[in-house]
Amino acid sequence: MKLTWLGHAAFRIETAKAVILIDPFLNGNPGAKGIDFKEATKGVTHIALTHGHGDHVGDTVAIAREHGAIVIANADLASWLGSQGVEKLDPGNTGGTVTHDGFTITFVNALHSSAMLTENGVSQALGNPNGLVFHFEDAPTLYHMGDTDIFSDMGLINELHQPEIGIVPIGDRFTMGGAVAALACQRYFNFKTVLPCHYASFPIIDQTADKFLAGMADHRETKVIADPAGTVHSF
């Protein structure tokens, strides 16, 4: 499996059977400078969304239309995407699992919100936010936390799924900050590898991973990858 951070909370996963984009906010993403849109979206078969905010839905509609990708999202967000012209949708909700060729995705809790501004400026709720747990046929289990704070039921997520790779928001203000994110990783999980995200994009959130790195410094059992966006990692 190849895993690439595309800036902010966006990731590309390549397996032998699928190319999955998570929260593909590319155009207008300050953290995606230097990311080639065509390369990032090349061959995409699936798009998985954690929640309905614009900096996570991003370019989903355009990518899905161009590539015929299947979009996996909570039921309310999926319905809204259908109204925007997305044809291939696989809706789910918290606790549910969807199955695709070579992988499954389970929707788990996240502490956040999920909405999109309508044309008249009113915020439209789009279901509950989620984290996403990916189980693969031939690769380690991966947990993208979505946007969230720490919560004690993370321990149940670990018990049920035992993820080896964690994608963790650290930017503060709209998610937990780096120190709390490090506590979440150490208290509730046995990750072999963690990748911080949701930082170094909008100026209103943290611009470095320093607080997270400091919090993880003594937790040597876990490899922390805080490389620049666009770096490809193999697992």
Curated annotation (Swiss-Prot):
Keywords: Hydrolase. SUPFAM superfamilies: Metallo-hydrolase/oxidoreductase. Transmembrane segments: none annotated. InterPro entries: Metallo-B-lactamas, RibonucZ/Hydroxyglut_hydro, UPF0173, UPF0173_UPF0282_UlaG_hydrolase. One of its GO terms (molecular function) is hydrolase activity. It comes from the Bacteria. Belongs to the UPF0173 family. HAMAP family: UPF0173. This is UPF0173 metal-dependent hydrolase Oant_3663. It comes from Brucella anthropi (strain ATCC 49188 / DSM 6882 / CCUG 24695 / JCM 21032 / LMG 3331 / NBRC 15819 / NCTC 12168 / Alc 37).
